[in-house]
Amino acid sequence: MKIGVYGASGRIGKLLLEELKGGYKGLALSSVFVRQKCETDFSSFSHAPLVTNDLKAFVRACECVIDFSLPKGVDNLLEALLECPKILVSGTTGLEKETLEKMQQLALKAPLLHAHNMSIGIMMLNQLAFLTSLKLKDADIEIIETHHNLKKDIPSGTALSLYETCAKARGYDEKNALITHREGLRSKESIGIAALRGGDVAGKHTIGFYLEGEYIELSHTATNRSIFAKGALEVALWLKDKAAKKYEINEMFG
């Protein structure tokens, strides 16, 4: 399958190019979208990709787009994909409502998956969080996320997805149960998220389930950002030959 990388100059984008250099499980890099000059030397790649700032040409040259860019960039990408539908794997966070609506429109034409975190470990953490939230009904739930000091969005998209998982399991009102700044006593049907920023931490997420006399913490730590690139490539492989639909990452585990 021919892969197009959108957001190639970012941290994950560069890792995607590295993983695709020799062909990842039969995947081939066919196109790279760049706004300015690309620093990557493609002479060592098994196939020379199309490197372009022409969005339509970029989309036409691939069968699947993997996106790790910025919210505005995703909006532009979706406009092109609605004209020329291709498989989409998107890991960009902080998307506006209008952009998400365009994504739903694309899902009528092509398979796509949008996730805040592409690591296999986070996929499992989500499933464990749902089960634990369901079983430990009296436990207070708190989430702590830690990232590098250059991360802009707070809380992280992954922390918000974990919150949504826990809130759904409990039947909480998702719009009102989230607490990111607490004063006074803790309300019963609430889930707090605390965000820490420092150094070069790739990502750590901990969900605490606090009972009287004991507590359980479920934690995931990313020690290498390559897991996000590899996870996105695995999603692309999984989406191949799937029907047009917006898929959830937990569906990969059946």
UniProtKB/Swiss-Prot annotation:
Positions bound to NADP(+): R35
InterPro entries on file: DapB_C (IPR022663), DapB_N (IPR000846), DapB_N_CS (IPR022664), DHDPR_bac (IPR023940), NAD(P)-bd_dom_sf (IPR036291)
Pathway: Amino-acid biosynthesis; L-lysine biosynthesis via DAP pathway; (S)-tetrahydrodipicolinate from L-aspartate: step 4/4
Keyword terms of this UniProt record: Amino-acid biosynthesis, Cytoplasm, Diaminopimelate biosynthesis, Lysine biosynthesis, NAD, NADP, Oxidoreductase
Main location: cytoplasm
Active-site residues from the entry: H147, K151
Localization: Cytoplasm
Binding residues for (S)-2,3,4,5-tetrahydrodipicolinate: H148, G157, T158
GO biological process: diaminopimelate biosynthetic process; lysine biosynthetic process via diaminopimelate
GO MF annotation terms: 4-hydroxy-tetrahydrodipicolinate reductase; NAD binding; NADP binding; oxidoreductase activity, acting on CH or CH2 groups, NAD or NADP as acceptor
Record keyword Amino-acid biosynthesis present: yes
EC number(s) stated in the UniProt entry for this protein: 1.17.1.8
The family this protein is said to belong to: Belongs to the DapB family.
Protein name (database record): 4-hydroxy-tetrahydrodipicolinate reductase
Species for this entry: Helicobacter pylori (strain ATCC 700392 / 26695) (Campylobacter pylori)
Gene field: dapB
